[in-house]
Structures are given as C-alpha cells and as structure tokens.
Amino acid sequence: MAYTILRFAKQKGGAARSIDAHHERTKEEYASNPDIDKSRIAQNYHLVTPRWSYEQEIKHRIQMAGCRVRRDSVKFVDTLVTVSPEFAKAHEAEMPEYFNRAFDFLKERVGEENIFSAVVHMDEKTPHMHLCFVPLTKDKRLSAKEILGNKKAMIQWQDDFYACMAERWPELERGTPAVETRRKHLTPQWYKKVTAMDTKLEKLEAALSDVNVFNAGKKREEAAALLKQLSLIHI
C-alpha cells in the first residue's frame, strides 16, 4: 500500500535556527540523521527559496503584518510532505510533479505569501518536502488555529490532500492523521522507524497467511527472518 503523507508541526520560534540548519543543509555533519547522503545534497531543490535566515524571515513577516504576538504564539509551521517509499521508488521520474502538486495544494490553503521556504530533499532514502510558513490570516492576525483548525479540521485536511493527490495517482491511499491514530506527531527520525516497523509487520502478516501443508516450511522461514528484522528496529 502506498500512502500520501502530510504532517504539520507547530513551532513557537525557538526551533527556527536548528530547523533552518537541517532543512537548508548548512551543517557539516548530520549525526542525528544518518540517512542523509552528503554526496547527494546537490540534488535537493527549492520551490520557495528563503531570502534570509528562518528567524529573519519569520520576524520580517510578523513585523510587516503588525500583528500581536503572545509568548505562546505559534510563529511558524513546519510542514512535511512525502509518500510511501515504494511509491517514490516506482515513480521516481514523477516525484517533481508530486511535490509541485502538493505545493499548489498548500499555497492555496495557507497563502503563498506566508511561505518562506519549500525545499525538496532528494538526499535521503525517501524524497520529501519541508514547507515552512508563518500562519498569518488574511486580516493580518497570527493564528495557526484559524489556518489549520481543530482536530476535526485536521481530518478534513487529510481528506482534501488525499483527494488532490489521488486525482493524479489513483493508486495512492489516504494517510491517517494523529487525531485518528491517537499517535502524537513524530519527529522525522521516529517517523522513519515507525514506518519501517509498519512495513515489516505487513510483510509478517502476509507471511503468516495462507499457510498450508505444502508451504509451511517456507512460511516459517519468512516469518523468522522478518521477526529478526523487527528486533533490529530500535524505537
């Protein structure tokens, strides 16, 4: 099964510098994310290139809007767009179209003028896009709650995003938002581990199905191999 994936992470501003360094690949080493292949960093590309640092981009937009900012205000939203690894591999040539379509969907919802960075990472196992925006309303208020909505609205976001992407790629399936799974939003590192575990569990379920007297030995070997692989995934 191939899933569309859309994740929002609300940020109050303190993480802007570290997120900037990660998304824009300004670090020399990436110990926290060993999946990054430094030899492929040049393959990354922007749909929106930041003019300044993330901190400056955020500060500039808020100042220009002249809006009120509280200590607990969400100053920007870090958005992740990706797709199941098997789909990305099978549709490698179509990945630019995938991210362009996702970008068009998001800019209509959050306001293109509020987006200060949209970068596609091709230097990891699965291509993905990080899109960051300041949640400014049309009447110049800082309100992530109004733009993203409540839990019910987040489910609608997933429905609409899936409909947009599946119109082009009908084989895709809808991702499940955290409000439905009861699972908190995951960091990229944890997400990769959970995805790997989910994939192994699906294969294990398949290996244990349709067991009969003729294939029992082979099925047992497949299950044992998958269980060993699961034990190596440290969550």
What are these regions (language model features)?
Residues M1-L232:
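N-terminal nicking endonuclease/strand-transfer module with a His-rich metal-binding environment
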